[in-house]
């Protein structure tokens, strides 16, 4: 996986709640022009759970087409880490095969939510999906969402026994997990899935981030990651601290509710629309977002 900085993309909707494809393409191009290495369509932040199978595939397709046709500032191509998560292994497998067929660089697969599988069930789930494709696979551990954690022993077993399982997105909130995973397998790539811990994870064995805040501030997320990769601890910490209040504000309600409203307030999407059961943020949250964006001089 030849990338380090990436954003978990929001999925913009029109007022009728259909996917706003033009806005989606524009957001991806902004990621490219502001220095991100990769984009992650249709993950948690992309509201994948409320997209139809057809919409899910179309979002992956748009991301791949846009990255293929738009060069980065270094005249290269931004990578696409396609979200293929589902609580049905068969659906994830289908999405994984589709993503590979149309040119995704790698896939991100979340643990099945609601089902609460055993560790053996998780192992078989990930193994089955990974063995159906040849491109790299990133595990995604986010127990607050799924109700089940990929135990360290299970993650290590998957890495050791399934050749194309190369990485894990760590959104457990546990630095202890990160340090333990890195201690046991230095080549197992760890990506931060928790913006408030980006700096800490990068200096505890992590090699990159998948950021929500990066939707709004891709340049600063990219700069922080690049500083960390060069072992410029203090410079990376200064950027992390600079983003502290924004990271906090974007998670006062369930993700992606605040980030979509923030993107709207910043003029980056026309409609801050959500599909039920997600709803618009409270007045208090909107006021907090407005105040925070003013502090960062995103809005006047």
Swiss-Prot record:
The active site is at 140 (proton donor/acceptor), 169 (schiff-base intermediate with substrate). Transmembrane segments: none annotated. It comes from the Bacteria. One of its GO terms (cellular component) is cytosol. One of its GO terms (biological process) is lysine biosynthetic process via diaminopimelate. Its EC number is 4.3.3.7. It catalyses: L-aspartate 4-semialdehyde + pyruvate = (2S,4S)-4-hydroxy-2,3,4,5-tetrahydrodipicolinate + H2O + H(+). Pyruvate binds at residues 45, 210. The record marks 44, 114 as: Part of a proton relay during catalysis. It is found in: Cytoplasm. Pfam families: DHDPS. Keywords: Amino-acid biosynthesis, Cytoplasm, Diaminopimelate biosynthesis, Lyase, Lysine biosynthesis, Schiff base. Pathway: Amino-acid biosynthesis; L-lysine biosynthesis via DAP pathway; (S)-tetrahydrodipicolinate from L-aspartate: step 3/4. Belongs to the DapA family. Homotetramer; dimer of dimers. PANTHER family: 4-HYDROXY-2-OXOGLUTARATE ALDOLASE, MITOCHONDRIAL, DIHYDRODIPICOLINATE SYNTHASE. Catalyzes the condensation of (S)-aspartate-beta-semialdehyde [(S)-ASA] and pyruvate to 4-hydroxy-tetrahydrodipicolinate (HTPA). This is 4-hydroxy-tetrahydrodipicolinate synthase. The gene is dapA.
């Amino acid at each position: 996986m030849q990338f380090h900085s990436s954003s978990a993309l929001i999925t913009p909707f029109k007022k009728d709640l259909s996917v706003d494809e033009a806005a989606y393409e524009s957001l991806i191009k902004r990621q490219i022009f502001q220095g991100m290495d990769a984009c992650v369509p249709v993950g948690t932040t992309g509201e994948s759970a409320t997209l139809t199978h057809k919409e899910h595939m179309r979002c992956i397709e748009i991301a791949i087409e846009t990255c293929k046709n738009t060069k980065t500032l270094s005249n290269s191509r931004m990578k696409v880490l396609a979200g293929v998560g589902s609580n049905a292994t068969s659906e994830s497998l289908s999405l994984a095969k589709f993503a590979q067929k149309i040119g995704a660089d790698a896939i991100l697969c979340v643990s099945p939510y609601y089902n609460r599988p055993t560790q053996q069930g998780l192992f078989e789930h990930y193994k089955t999906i990974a063995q159906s494709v040849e491109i790299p696979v990133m595990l995604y551990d986010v127990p607050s969402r799924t109700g089940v954690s990929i135990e360290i022993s299970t993650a290590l077993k998957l890495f050791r026994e399934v050749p194309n399982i190369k990485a894990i997105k760590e959104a457990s909130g546990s630095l202890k997990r990160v340090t333990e995973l890195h201690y046991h397998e230095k080549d197992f790539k760890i990506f931060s899935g928790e913006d408030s811990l980006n700096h800490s994870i990068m200096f505890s064995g992590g090699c990159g981030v998948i950021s929500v805040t990066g939707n709004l501030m891709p340049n600063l997320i990219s700069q922080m990651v690049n500083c960390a990769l060069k072992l410029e601890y203090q410079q990376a910490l200064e950027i992390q601290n600079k983003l502290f209040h924004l990271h906090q504000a974007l998670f006062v309600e369930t993700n992606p509710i605040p980030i979509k409203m923030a993107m709207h307030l910043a003029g980056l999407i026309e409609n801050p629309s959500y599909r039920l059961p997600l709803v618009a943020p409270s007045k208090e949250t909107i006021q907090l977002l407005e105040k925070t964006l003013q502090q960062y001089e995103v809005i006047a």
